[in-house]
Amino acid sequence: MINKAIAKIFGTQNEREIKRLMPIVAQINALEPQVKQFSDDQLRAKTDEFRAKIQERLAKYEEAEHKNHALKEVLDEILPEAFAICREAGWRVLNMRHFDVQLIGGMVLHSGRISEMKTGEGKTLVATLPVYLNALSGRGVHVVTVNDYLAKRDSEWMGKLYNFLGLSVGVIVHDLDDDQRREAYRADVTYGTNNEFGFDYLRDNMKFELSDCVQREFNFAIVDEVDSILIDEARTPLIISGASEESTDKYQRVNVIIPRLEKGEEIEGREPGDKILTGDYVVDEKHKTITVSDDGWEKVEKLLGIGNIADPENWDLKHHVEVAIKAHALYHVDVEYVVKDGEVLIVDEFTGRLMPGRRWSDGLHQAVEAKEGVKVERENQTLATITFQNYFRLYKKLAGMTGTAETEAAEFDKIYKLEVVVIPTNRTLLRKENPDVVYRTEKEKFFAVADEIAKLSVSQQPVLVGTVSIEKSERLSELLKRKNIKHVVLNAKFHEREAEYVAQAGRLGQVTIATNMAGRGTDILLGGNPEFMAKQETLKKGVAQPVHAAGGEVDARPDDPNTVYWYYAGNEYVCPRAQWEEILAHYKTQTDFEHEQVKQAGGLFILGTERHESRRIDNQLRGRAGRQGDPGASRFYLSLEDDLMRIFAKEWVSTLLQRLGMEEGVPIESKMISRRIEKAQEAVEAQNFEARKHLLEYDDVMNKQRMAVYGLRRQLLEGLDQKELIIDEYVTEILGDLLDKFAPTEKHPEDWDIAGLKGEIFTRFGVDIIAEGVEPEKLNRMQLGDGIFDKLKERYEAKEQLIGNDQMRHHERVIMLSVIDQLWKDHLLNMDHLKEGIGLRGYAQHDPLVEYKRESFDMFEGMMATFKEQTVRYLYLMQIIDAATNMPVEIPRRRAPENVRELGPVLEAENAPEPQISGGNGQQPPQRRQQTSLDDLEKQFERKKKRELEQARMAGGGMPDAVQQVVRSGDKIGRNDPCFCGSGKKYKKCHGA
């Protein structure tokens, strides 16, 4: 109440922010007359002028932190003039002038916030303002879209403006090779999808050469449809995986018994709070979980012919039974997935689009394949993974735009530190939002929807019907066919021409049935979209040709004034400008006339057939109508059998039925019911937010480890000298551990296990300390350690002298990269196993997250210790072979002889086994049974990496079910100084590892 009173007096925070930006809008408008006098060349010259000013300012500073602060200041200074230049370029090149509210939206994006702009307010054009301004720094700007079509369309469409102003533009889509990707990332402005940006990051961190990496620094990203990417897809980690060796027979074995299990329910026991499970298993649709009863497990044991399911040897089967029940009870064909060409394809629950290449993880996808009787693919092992939350946190500055962000403002702030600013519409919103209509059954609801569409068709008012699944869109389509109502069905099965169908949904008398989110990013113009109609006509007449035709590339250039380029159905076409403009003008006249007719009919009518779990998705559907001051209307038709009502408002629905005694076919229309439904949606949103936060809390643990490993890889790729690290830290730590074990300080020297110490030193380093002149019996603990360390250092430097400094650095890099990659892959698998079982700790009154943090830290420490041990062992045991005699060369303390090549015992097999070295008696270690030269070894690595990177190029995300990146600035940290991350550990044992 108090907040409302304050808002009434002082205005809301949003209104105050808009008011604060208005003087800058006035500055930009004041510059417009002057800018309009510039010639095209003078306008372009301003880009070079801005760039020079930025570089001059940055040249005054050396520290990265100071440069970043200076960059922010200078960009803010030139913002009014840069926006004025961009606005004028938009008018000259695109025939589009930025409205004042679009200038405000651009300023919000530049400041690293989310700009909420209603559908049709020109978000694509708004983005050009902050993109142009920030691209002047030369550090690159990424514009992130939800699909390849929008990335191509926007890069080509807005690219004309950027090219006119002297900026380069690149686009990242699925089928590009590394050279094409690298070129696109080097551009001033790069368009692409969230998946492509994320997978490129993971692939870069699997590369063996710095020159093979494609991305550069993460400077500034603007995320289009930011709610879809950062909220809806937040539970979908990006995963690059490779096939595991496990058999798929177990999925078939388990699948055949599931139909013989009986579904039950949870009922109240005699004592308060007691729950009794009937049947063999119970399904919780609200949380998407299943619980198997004791009777159910007994039946499973009998059906599978095994002993106690709880025995460790049966844990794997237990997991597969639970996953198979989920596949049968919670995942339905034409709802969560479709079967196409013998393959199970996931349907995106938010967009209704198919997601080829994506697979559910944890064995779920295999369980669904077994259920549907298609080929069961092998389960995958994770090679690299990251969530969108942690990927987008890599950017120094992040911004977003969407038509619906306000309902998720708290989550954007908490997770991403992004503030939402609602931008006023350029024209008054005229859309009429009618109250919900609720029917008793789903059957009654769909009959009523069909009747309503029939009525609207009489007046030829266009209708866009939103459905939640393929199955329901096809069900409604059948009803309309019976009424002879012409319509278009747009769902995941027929999405290839999605943008075209949605763009024409505003034509007179048009009826379009689509999933709630179909065609997002495509404007629905009342009367139809003349450009789409012109494209179809030019293709039909053969006027337009594909750019990459069968006979070769069409002889035309994007900057040729006599041609027009455009995308259609995923392909690029070129058309003579004169013919294009003639055909376009014809259809423009037709659609302008039809536009007025549609307005008279009431504009686009949005008819929702079910409320989504999120209010935001409902608002997005409503937002398709009433763009830019056009009339429009919306209404939702619901039933008490809808999932939202049945699962999340069950008790309220039962009470409603009893009180009102609803009769068949009689609807309820009440704002009170709409409010209750929104309350149910708020509860679901809160639950989903907790799920996303839960995922992030776990991924933050992994993120720290990932940043440490990727940081080490980057150092190695950049060719930094690792000798000091290997000798002064790795060797020192390993030697210290050996001394603690065999010559502990608490024991008298006479009780030390010198034979054991000597054997371990020989096994790990190939050095016989006795033969090298170390006399343990005459030394104290410190002298013994120093003596051994000196001999180990001498051996390393002698080997380095023999093969040369450059070659030694090269082999250090190859060995360290291959060892850390193999260990990281194994670590990811172990982390998956840990996460699977960590929830059970709750039964022992232990916080699973705390336990996960503790155990994962121990596992990571163990992995890094193994990395150091294997690195040192492989480098020390690497043998030098005389090329003439093909025999090992003794490592002398002199210059290297001529005609030597290297031979090493490192990773003779591709999966890096331990080197088989025997020690003792002062003898040189024998050669391995099969020796592998480092040249051959590197070829093995290259082949292996090629396979993994090829898998990575085709990668899809797994779908199971914030810590800021630490940036160090200032003076170099010493190895024994406290680590900058605040862990309390020494730098050499933390981020210096």
Swiss-Prot record:
NCBIfam families: PRK12904.1 (NF009538), secA (TIGR00963). The gene is secA. Residues 910-962 are annotated as: Disordered. Monomer and homodimer. Part of the essential Sec protein translocation apparatus which comprises SecA, SecYEG and auxiliary proteins SecDF. Other proteins may also be involved. Zn(2+) binds at C979, C981, C990, H991. This is Protein translocase subunit SecA. Residues 936-951 have a biased composition (Basic and acidic residues). Coiled coil: none annotated. It is a peripheral membrane protein. SUPFAM superfamilies: Helical scaffold and wing domains of SecA, P-loop containing nucleoside triphosphate hydrolases, Pre-protein crosslinking domain of SecA. Its main location: membrane.
